[in-house]
Amino acid sequence: MTSLLKDLLDHHAWADAMFFHAWGKSLVREDPDLRARTGHIVEVQEAFLAILSGRAAATEERPLPEFGDLRARFRTSHEAFQALARGLDSASLARLIRVPWFPDPPCLVSVSDALVQVCLHTQHHRGQNMARLKALGAEPKNVDYLIWLWKQKPEGRWES
């Protein structure tokens, strides 16, 4: 695993934990927009974990998830990504996988590119969620990569 990819995954976990800390301190845990978008994020993370592990991605409809369930799923997802990443060497990172939700033409990407996609997809929607928190009167956190570096690469803390 490259050091940059490891850093992206570590930042990804920290930034998500910071988002949940901000959301958890707010009075808007029940906001349907936040719950729906955060549910989408973790569903995509779980789908990529399945694909990267050689399993089929789940496609069933789920009810709007609750805050506590979402936080638990995110934490589990990040633990799984960290475990997966520890076992990846150069050949594993270069292996091609097929992203099934883009069927025609087939979307083939390397494991490395899939991991970057997970981080960037989450970053995009996490930014939307932070903006939503602010619009609802909560206090979002600045989770820029540079801030994570400046703070000496802290680990994500999932406890409230």
Predicted regions and their residues:
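Active-site rim elements
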Residues: T2-K6, F67
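Short, contiguous alpha-helical
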Residues: K6-R62, F102-S160
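Helix-adjacent hinge/juxtasegments
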Residues: A56-P100
